Amino acid sequence: MSQRQQRVADLIHQQLAELLKKEVRDSRLSKISLTAVSISPDLKQAKVFYSLLENQNEKEVQKALNKATGYLRHLLAQATVLRYVPKLEFVYDESIERAHRISFLIERALKKDDSDESS
């Protein structure tokens, strides 16, 4: 990713996080965290990765984000000085969930090892 792409991605990440916190009134979107933004080389499309902070229905949150995409893009255009605001695509980030699952499995295996050694 070029420096310009990274700067634009960082700007979009920062502004969208702020807009979701202050401007969007949909309660399904109040408990999400933006984890990363990836932008195309031509700066026309941005993938916004998010994770859920609480046990929420991922499909419902995705539906709410898809519905709010146009509104968020409009707010982003007002909040930034970008010549062209990229199309936004929201993608659920499973990496955090996967990391928790791996940690759990490792802990369980270590506990099993400890109990086997003490028997």
Swiss-Prot record:
Its main location: cytoplasm. It holds the Pfam family RBFA. InterPro entries: KH_dom-like_a/b (IPR015946), RbfA (IPR000238), RbfA_dom_sf (IPR023799), Ribosome-bd_factorA_CS (IPR020053). One of its GO terms (cellular component) is cytosol. One of its GO terms (biological process) is maturation of SSU-rRNA. GO terms for molecular function: ribosomal small subunit binding. Keywords: Cytoplasm, Ribosome biogenesis. Gene3D superfamilies: 3.30.300.20. It comes from the Bacteria. It is found in: Cytoplasm. Monomer. Binds 30S ribosomal subunits, but not 50S ribosomal subunits or 70S ribosomes. Belongs to the RbfA family. NCBIfam families: PRK13817.1 (NF010390), rbfA (TIGR00082). One of several proteins that assist in the late maturation steps of the functional core of the 30S ribosomal subunit. Associates with free 30S ribosomal subunits (but not with 30S subunits that are part of 70S ribosomes or polysomes). Required for efficient processing of 16S rRNA. May interact with the 5'-terminal helix region of 16S rRNA. This is Ribosome-binding factor A. The lineage of its organism: Bacteria, Pseudomonadati, Pseudomonadota, Gammaproteobacteria, Legionellales.
